[in-house]
Amino acid sequence: MLPANQPSTDYNLKVNPEKFQSLEDARCFLLKQVKEWDNPQNKTTPENSGVVRLEASLESAHPLEWLTLQDCSQKIYWENRSQKEQFAGIGTALEIADGKDGYENILQVISKILKDSPETVRFYGGMRFDSKASISPEWETWGTARFTIPLVELSIIEENVTLACNFLPDDKKNSKLQPLQNLLESLRTEDVIIPDNPLIGLERHDLPEYRQWCRLVEQ
């Protein structure tokens, strides 16, 4: 699962001025911001139609450990090889799926959304190498392509730690901010205790195997 973003003008971005000491403090800050945004007396509107993103900077956090705590059926996680970039997300603020009309079309839609959104907004997902190949049962719901922006995201880039939430400008008038508020209210922020002897995988099966994967990439 790969993240995708691109530079843009941050019309829709709001960030806390200083770093929070705990995830709980960051959670409370974001919840307050979302409630203020959802207040009928608040007439603030973004300057474009892109994603609205609220961010809270943190001193430290562990995205994967945080993700294991969350009671949410929609979860994503990605990190680079050096582990200097880690992203964990829950819920779905926006999803673009299928791609039967062609991968170029779906990528154009994603590019337009990112252009109108803060540069820290990212889609997570991917697409099949061969859209015409048969699909195994466990991947049928995925379709040919699927990209998601999570509702709530915890990320580390180099040493910058951020808890953020994403939503669309129309979510306010369509009463779609309540699910985000519910998610923030139920967000678990306590520390995770990692066992000294984690489970060890006994078997590994790669499909496709490495050589076949290389051939697919080169096609």
What are these regions (language model features)?
Residues 1-219:
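Signature of the chorismate-utilizing enzyme
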